[in-house]
Design a protein with these regions (language model features):
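A transmembrane-helix-recognition feature enriched in membrane-embedded lipid enzymes
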Residues: 106-128
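A structural signal for short, hydrophobic/glycine-enriched beta-strand patches
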Residues: 1-109
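The feature marks non-catalytic terminal segments
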Residues: 125-145
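A general structural signal for short secondary-structure boundary/capping elements
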Residues: 92, 114-121, 137-143
């Protein structure tokens, strides 16, 4: 709905990609194209978003993003927003409330305590994430039709 309503022009999907058989951003992109009908040219994968801190820093420094609408699990939204804002990214959040409150959801909620402690350490220590070179994917997606 965010793309079709014009609230966003490009979608940056971020996650881990340790092997060719496990590709979180690739899976997200396929879902958005096949199920939501979003043009593939408007979806940019970040395959080095190993954690929320890396994702926020990379969005700003590698992809040139200055403001973002974060869509994430409800239990993760506050930490994601705080992380992005503390790393210089102007962000607002939209929680995904569609996930059932099953064992996976409760596990995710439970690990938030440790994840929040790690986030504080990352921000305070200014940990340098895996960056790589700049990526023009977002700029190119903005210019595509």
């Amino acid at each position: 709905a965010l793309y079709s309503s014009g609230r966003t022009k490009v979608i940056l999907v971020s996650g881990d990609n340790p092997t060719r058989y496990y590709d979180e951003p690739g899976a997200m992109k396929k879902y958005l194209v096949r199920v939501k009908g979003i043009p593939a040219s408007k979806i940019v994968p970040d395959r080095a978003g190993f954690d929320t801190y890396d994702t926020c820093v990379r969005a700003r420094r590698i992809f040139g993003v200055h403001s973002a609408i974060l869509v994430t699990q409800e239990y993760h939204e506050l930490r994601a927003l705080a992380t992005c804002r503390m790393t210089g990214l102007d962000a607002v959040g939209v929680p995904d409330r569609g996930q059932p409150r099953d064992d996976v959801w409760w596990y995710g909620l439970g690990r938030e305590f440790g994840s929040r402690l790690k986030m504080i350490w990352d921000v305070v220590s200014r940990r340098e994430p895996t960056l790589g070179g700049t990526d023009d994917g977002v700029r190119e997606a903005l210019n595509s039709r």
